[in-house]
A protein has these predicted regions:
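Short strand-turn motif at the edge of the Rossmann-like AdoMet-binding core
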Residues: 138, 169-173, 199
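Short, well-ordered turn and helix-capping elements at secondary-structure junctions
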Residues: 17, 117, 198-200
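The AdoMet/dcAdoMet-binding core of the Class I SAM-like
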Residues: 3-8, 44-165, 175-184, 205-207
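General small-molecule cofactor/ligand-binding pocket signal
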Residues: 14, 112-114, 195-197
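SAM/dcSAM-binding transferase cores
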Residues: 1-28, 36-46, 50-54, 58-65, ...
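Conserved S-adenosyl-L-methionine
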Residues: 191-202
C-alpha cells in the first residue's frame, strides 16, 4: 500500500482481493474521503471495472462513431484514454501526483496529460476543436463549482464541433437534488439536447453516479449497452453563474 499527499488530496493506492463484492486481484486509487478514483483488474488489465466509464464509452461510440478528438477534465487512472489509445485525447488534471501514480501503478503510458485547472486549459483551446468534452473531476466537496456554471458550459459549447457532445459524471441523488438539478438546468441553456442516466439504486436518497450528456444534435443510446444505467428525468433547478 502507498499513501501520498498532494496539495489537493491525500491519495492511497492499495491492492485488494475483493472489490464491491467481486473476488479477484485489484489495484485501487482512492482519495482521503474514501472516493475511489480508479481501479485495475490485475488479472485482466484491459477490463473496465466500473459501469460509468462503460456507459460513457457507449455514448461516445454511438453518437459519433468516427470521433478523433477528446478533451477530458479529471484523469484518475486514465481509463478512457487508455481504452481509446488510438484517438487524440488531451487530459487536464489538477494534481501532478495523480498522474504520476497512474503511470507507476496503473500502467498509464501516454503523454497527453496537462497539469492545471481544466477550465482554464480548455478556454485556451481552439474553437470547434473537439468531438467530446468529458467532465470527471471531483474534490471532497463534489464537482468543482467553476465547472458547473453557465459561463463554463458556454466555453465547452464553443470548443466542440457541430456534432460534439459534453458528457458529465456527477455524484448525487436522482430525485430532489438541488445541485444536480441546477447543473442540468444550467447545461440546458447551452445545449438543445440533453439526456440523463443513473444506475438503479436502493432509494431515491442514495448518492450515486449520474451521467448527463449535452449535444448540439439529437442523442442516441441503446439501453442494453448502457452498463446498467437507465434514463432518468431530472427536475428543474436554478441557474449557476460564475
Amino acid at each position: 500500500m502507498l499513501q501520498a499527499n498532494s496539495s489537493n488530496h491525500e491519495i492511497t493506492v492499495y491492492d485488494t482481493t475483493e472489490l464491491y463484492g467481486e473476488k479477484g486481484k485489484f489495484r485501487v486509487m482512492e482519495f482521503s474521503n474514501k472516493a475511489i478514483q480508479g481501479a485495475l483488474d490485475l488479472n485482466h488489465p484491459k477490463r473496465i471495472l466500473f459501469e460509468y466509464p462503460r456507459a460513457i464509452i457507449h455514448l461516445m461510440e454511438i453518437n459519433e462513431p468516427y470521433f478523433e478528438d477528446v478533451f477530458v477534465i479529471g484523469h484518475g487512472i486514465g481509463t478512457l484514454a487508455g481504452y481509446f489509445a488510438e484517438k487524440r485525447f488531451k487530459i487536464a488534471e489538477l494534481d501532478a501526483e495523480v498522474v504520476e501514480l497512474s503511470r507507476t501503478y496503473f500502467g498509464y503510458n501516454q503523454d497527453n496529460v496537462v497539469i492545471g485547472d481544466g477550465r482554464y486549459i480548455l478556454e485556451s483551446e481552439q474553437p470547434n476543436a473537439y468531438d467530446f468534452i468529458i467532465l470527471d473531476a471531483f474534490t471532497a466537496a463534489g464537482t468543482p463549482r467553476h465547472l458547473t456554471t453557465s459561463e463554463f458550459f458556454s466555453a465547452t459549447h464553443s470548443k466542440l464541433n457541430s456534432r460534439g457532445s459534453i458528457i458529465m459524471n456527477l455524484m448525487g441523488k436522482v430525485e430532489h437534488d438541488p445541485l444536480v438539478n441546477a447543473i442540468h438546468t444550467t447545461l440546458s441553456e447551452q445545449y438543445p439536447y440533453l439526456k440523463s442516466f443513473a444506475l438503479p439504486a436502493e432509494g431515491a436518497a442514495d448518492i450515486q453516479n449520474i451521467l448527463i450528456i449535452g449535444r448540439k444534435r439529437p442523442i442516441q443510446f441503446q439501453a442494453r449497452q448502457m452498463a446498467g444505467f437507465t434514463e432518468i428525468n431530472l427536475g428543474q433547478g436554478h441557474m449557476i453563474w460564475d
